[in-house]
């Protein structure tokens, strides 16, 4: 049986307390995971500070660029190991893990290496009345030891999205992956060891949230900043702990994202895009659309076409190359999603597709599978329409005017993303800017330029990451002002 240990101060550390890593494909045990206690988290934080006081704290930006590229190269060399671990932990199809999760996880290190290598220096010249002048420039410095708490839906991608810029800025990190997906984080620690990164720069601690590693990190007085992706409720708990220490936080939380489909859209292109927006990763992407607004003239056509597409969607073994949807992350999460299927029935929804659990007649029946599901007929104040479900389910409803759909789409406590489908260029710009979200896609979905800002409004998060926005979060700027006299004093 595989053992996933903690990695602290450059050493692999076992724990007296362990838990099981279970695959959602068939409910079998993948590995035994060693849970970090408070003392081990404290040791990780101290190791991070020692690294900052030693060799790592003296690295230049150019040296850190080289480190990030070496990490990416070693990850690429072990790409198959990362694929196997990611698919075992999550059950996501090979078609997704091999084209999105693992390549993007590697690309995050290369991308932030490139950004750091070309990052502009904020500098200004101020001319003074006596003929002298002042030169001001911003010196970028690390925050210190950053607590990184990452989610289970895109485990490697979102972990490296945080770790790469944190290291680029010269920080040390204490990483806690989700208890549901410890595999690729452990492999990343192996990569750090293989490339020889100084002890204490990258520390990995396994565990849960309350009364475990997540809480120990968020409450630690010597953690300099916290970055978290996950549920809004957990984010609120972490924020309260961070507020007591007055430390920076970056949160990417939940979403109840809207798709707005106008009658003038390219219908087939829209259908292709919406199948991804609804069911990629079994709907377990914070950017997935759970509320779909369709202009009335094409509403019936859309419902029929979507139901037909779902019938053809292949829900099968993740390692099959043509599988399009796998299981949910866990039996616990499957039960949550199924409870919303039942709530939809109680609230009077019409099921256009799905609504149950697929039966395979083999060991997969012990896994965490649900059917891709589409419902209709609910009011905008129904709980199923307002609460984040985070599964392969959406509610479709018609609308009659642009102003109506903007109002309805914005009627939510969340504000992460929206996708808009129209061939009217003016409408595309107009509606996109009126959506109260962090990102609006037009005639596409999940198309990401890693240099651009990413984050949400309302309950969907605090702050922006991506490109220079990430470097600005993970560093402090000191303005250096130097007066240059007009003449040398010895002239």
From Swiss-Prot:
EC number(s) stated in the UniProt entry for this protein: 1.2.1.32
InterPro entries: Ald_DH/histidinol_DH (IPR016161), Ald_DH_C (IPR016163), Ald_DH_CS_CYS (IPR016160), Ald_DH_CS_GLU (IPR029510), Ald_DH_N (IPR016162), Aldehyde_DH_dom (IPR015590), OHmuconic_semiald_DH (IPR017628)
Molecular function per GO: aminomuconate-semialdehyde dehydrogenase activity
The keyword NAD is annotated on this UniProt entry: yes
Family: Belongs to the aldehyde dehydrogenase family.
The protein's assembly and partners: Homotrimer.
PANTHER family, A to Z: 2-AMINOMUCONIC SEMIALDEHYDE DEHYDROGENASE (PTHR43720:SF2)
Protein name: 2-aminomuconic 6-semialdehyde dehydrogenase
Species the sequence originates in: Pseudomonas sp
Encoding gene (name): amnC
């Amino acid at each position: 049986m595989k053992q996933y240990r903690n990695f602290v101060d450059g050493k692999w550390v076992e724990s007296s307390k362990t838990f099981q890593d279970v695959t959602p494909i068939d409910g079998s045990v993948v590995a035994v995971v060693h849970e970090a206690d408070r003392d081990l988290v404290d040791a990780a934080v101290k190791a991070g500070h020692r690294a900052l006081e030693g060799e790592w704290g003296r690295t230049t930006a150019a040296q850190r660029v080289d480190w990030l590229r070496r990490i990416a190269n070693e990850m690429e060399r072990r790409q198959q190991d990362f694929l196997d671990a990611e698919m075992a932990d999550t059950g996501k199809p090979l078609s997704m893990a091999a084209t999105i999760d693992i390549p993007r996880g590697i690309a995050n290190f290369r991308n932030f290496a490139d950004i750091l290598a070309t990052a502009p220096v904020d500098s200004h010249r101020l001319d003074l009345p006596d003929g002298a002048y002042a030169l001001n420039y911003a010196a970028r410095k690390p925050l210190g030891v950053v607590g990184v708490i990452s989610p289970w839906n895109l485990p490697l991608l979102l972990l490296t999205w945080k770790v790469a810029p944190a290291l680029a800025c010269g920080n040390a990190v204490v990483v806690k992956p989700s208890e549901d997906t410890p595999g690729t984080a452990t492999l990343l620690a192996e990569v750090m060891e293989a490339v020889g990164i100084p002890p204490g720069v990258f520390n990995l601690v396994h565990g849960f949230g309350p009364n475990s590693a997540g809480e120990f990190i968020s409450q630690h007085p010597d953690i300099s900043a916290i970055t978290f992706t996950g549920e809004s409720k957990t984010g609120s708990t972490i924020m309260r702990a961070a507020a007591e220490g007055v430390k920076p936080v970056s949160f990417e939380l939940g979403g109840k994202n809207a798709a707005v489909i106008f009658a003038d859209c390219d219908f087939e292109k829209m259908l292709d895009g919406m199948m991804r927006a609804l069911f990629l990763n079994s709907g377990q992407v914070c950017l997935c659309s759970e509320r779909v607004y369709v202009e009335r003239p094409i509403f019936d056509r859309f419902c029929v076409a979507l139901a037909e597409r779902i019938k053809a969607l292949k829900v099968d073994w993740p390692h099959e190359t043509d599988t399009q949807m796998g299981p949910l992350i866990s039996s616990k999460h499957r039960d949550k999603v199924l409870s919303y299927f039942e709530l939809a029935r109680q609230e009077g929804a019409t099921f256009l597709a799905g609504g149950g659990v697929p039966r395979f007649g083999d060991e997969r029946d012990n896994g965490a599978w649900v059917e891709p599901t589409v419902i209709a007929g609910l009011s905008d104040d129904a709980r199923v329409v307002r609460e984040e479900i985070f599964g392969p389910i959406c509610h479709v409803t018609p609308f009659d005017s642009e102003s109506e759909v903007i109002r309805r789409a914005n009627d939510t406590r969340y504000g992460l993303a929206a996708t808009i489908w129209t061939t009217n260029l003016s409408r595309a710009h107009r509606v996109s800017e009126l959506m109260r979200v962090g990102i609006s896609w037009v005639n596409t979905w999940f198309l990401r330029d890693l240099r651009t800002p990413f984050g949400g409004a309302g309950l969907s998060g605090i702050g922006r990451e991506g490109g220079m926005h990430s470097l600005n979060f993970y560093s402090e700027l000191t303005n250096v002002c130097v007066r240059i006299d007009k003449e040398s004093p010895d002239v």
